[in-house]
């Protein structure tokens, strides 16, 4: 997949990311015990939890380097490897960079940034999903 620009080759990533985007938009809860990237709900299987984001990381093809992207938050520029998939179009996905929450007392580990990027999924070697969470201002 990494060196093949055939759009049909990225379908496994496209399917997973489309599931994540759909879940983030609807926030439905159901009782299923799968614990994978395409688990059919965000967070726990009770209505007492509320999550709106399934954070993801990307690894490049070949050398499996963790992707990082720049962001600016509160006047400080840094890099993050944690993203929120906002949209999927064919073999491309648009992601928002998530920054570590500066409020160390918060239960929510990430905050939203205004940094967005589009990634060609043919350049991705692996996707890793992090625990579901709530991100404000999404």
Predicted features and spans:
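Short glycine-rich, low-complexity segments
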Residues: 1-89, 94-138
